[in-house]
């Protein structure tokens, strides 16, 4: 089976510090993968590189055969990353935060709202949509 995600000798530096060094691997479609490691090992950065939120300094990342540096705009609507860090605006409702994120990816309002309703229902989050994020307890 062909890999949906392929990394070839990928490296990432931050302030001349190596975060990722020469990573090469593939993940097949439908696979369940766990990324484990110590704090500051680069797990979050790896996910940010794979999801096109960060560029690697060297090497190549392919998502469904598309080069992430050359075809980022095509890849972004097809992949997402949910950070363990809270990147939501506390003064907006959960619904407004999600709508804003959709607009950043140039998704039309109707599609955003349809998906928002569907996923909120599936994840049992409907009752939180109209609440300010700062008022939602984890």
At which residue positions do the language-model features occur?
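Conserved ABC transporter NBD signature motif
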Residues: 59-67, 75
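The feature captures the beta-strand-to-loop junction immediately N-terminal to the Walker
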Residues: 36-38
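Helix-to-loop junction immediately C-terminal to a conserved catalytic motif
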Residues: 51
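Conserved ABC ATPase "signature" region
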Residues: 99, 103, 110-128
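Short coil-to-beta microelement around the adenine-binding A-loop and adjacent beta1/P-loop entry
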Residues: 17-18, 73
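Conserved ABC ATPase signature
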Residues: 132-138
